[in-house]
Amino acid sequence: MRVSLRFTILAVSAMIFFPVIVFIYVVEAHTSPKVIADDQERSYGVICDAGSTGTRLFVYNWISTSDSELIQIEPVIYDNKPVMKKISPGLSTFGTKPAQAAEYLRPLMELAERHIPEEKRPYTPVFIFATAGMRLIPDEQKEAVLKNLRNKLPKITSMQVLKEHIRIIEGKWEGIYSWIAVNYALGKFNKTATLDFPGTSPAHARQKTVGMIDMGGASAQIAFELPDTDSFSSINVENINLGCREDDSLFKYKLFVTTFLGYGVNEGIRKYEHMLLSKLKDQNGTVIQDDCMPLNLHKTVTLENGENFVRRGTGNWNTCSNEVKKLLNPESSSEVCKAEAAKCYFGAVPAPSIPLSNIEMYGFSEYWYSTHDVLGLGGQYDAENIAKKTQQYCSKRWSTIQAESKKQLYPRADEERLRTQCFKSAWITSVLHDGFSVDKTHNKFQSVSTIAGQEVQWALGAMIYHMRFFPLRDSSRNLIVKETHSSSESLWAPLFFLSAVFCLFVLVCAKEQSVLCFDDKRRSSFGMSRSQYSYKMLKENRTSSSFLENFA
């Protein structure tokens, strides 16, 4: 009876102790990894570029790993292409019918939701940023459109729509976002390790950033970083921080950034045609010789006031360049720009003393199309070669160019591009050299359409800037995870102590039980060998182990 009682005590103790250990282990094993996995889960963001001719949707995603690094944002990829969709017309056309504005964006919201997990949608921010088109409509129309979007869009989508995320942005911020996107795509925000002295730990240094010029249809934008030592002061200087901590200067940048309204290529053509009309009035005719069109190309022009005249191409591109240059210097300029020592862009906007020729600059939009589509000279800028090829092209008869186009000699250019190439070549080069004072021979300028295989959009820069505080959330969660691990680890010390006590208890019980068994056997037979005794003990232990395993 004594053996049976002790064995029962041992079994009951095991039944109580081992389930407790297993329970704690399971809770620890299933809770902590889940928290860690949550910390690494993917987040999403949606942005709409509401331009003058249409609205484009972009969907981005990221995994935040550290609050000491810049947030890493990438486009969501579907079928090997970034998720993107454009709808027309522009948002500004709803100025007279604002009640339809939110419904107009429904297809974009539905597309975005198809590429975002359902459980993520309530935490996915939606940004609607309107640009030039919305800036031009009356204020009451602007407010009516924005009000409709802010009130009705949350009812259309389950994604996160905040009122402050729906607004009209300044042209300056388009430039800032573009600058961020370009440098991000080039990896210029990645930290590099430098050793100040041999044997010391590496210090983090940041790379030199690049500047950008974006030549659109209505305006041109420029943005580049100023050295910290540059004392230049202007309304066009902006200090931005891309990091999530205000006390960290690693991602703080001082930029010169501004928009030149009226200096896009389409506005340039409009100014040029007004200049031609003023010359024609002096001649009392209806047809004027035009050096900025291919030989014998005719174009009938109707101006805003209803006046008509005909441009007839002569293909003299050198003369064209000289005429275009006159359009860049305004008749009136600020007193600062009239000063001989002052440096100004386009003779009107005060600029830093740092020469743009010394800065690595990237040209987008028309700087790419006008050098690449017809001339095939996109990439590293070569002013002499561009002038030579443009002169050769413009001196051709228009009928010859048409024939060459049919033979696919200009596969990337439509007819409108072929008609306007001469003027656009003159405009973009004149803006670069005469407007921004970039040296024709010694410069670091290049035209691009994509970086690392992706088309660079200011929307990416906007998402990076507005999500910059996101890593702080994960940093706080990491701290909670760390503390949770510390707390759970501290539980194992008493558990180990209890395990030791239990093991001691088992040993004592096992010893007493073995003595009793030996005494009983000795009474029945003193002739049992050691091997037989050992076998009996081994068999009994196996039985006990099997019993205990049923409760493990």
Swiss-Prot record:
Upregulating conditions: In contrast to uda-1, expression is not induced by stress.
Keyword annotations of the record: Developmental protein, Differentiation, Glycoprotein, Golgi apparatus, Gonadal differentiation, Hydrolase, Membrane, Transmembrane, Transmembrane helix
Catalytically driven reaction(s): a ribonucleoside 5'-diphosphate + H2O = a ribonucleoside 5'-phosphate + phosphate + H(+)
EC numbers, comma separated: 3.6.1.6
Tissues in which the protein is found: Expressed in body wall muscles.
InterPro entries according to UniProt: GDA1_CD39_NTPase (IPR000407)
Protein family according to the UniProt entry: Belongs to the GDA1/CD39 NTPase family.
Name of this protein: Nucleoside-diphosphatase mig-23
Organism expressing this protein natively: Caenorhabditis elegans
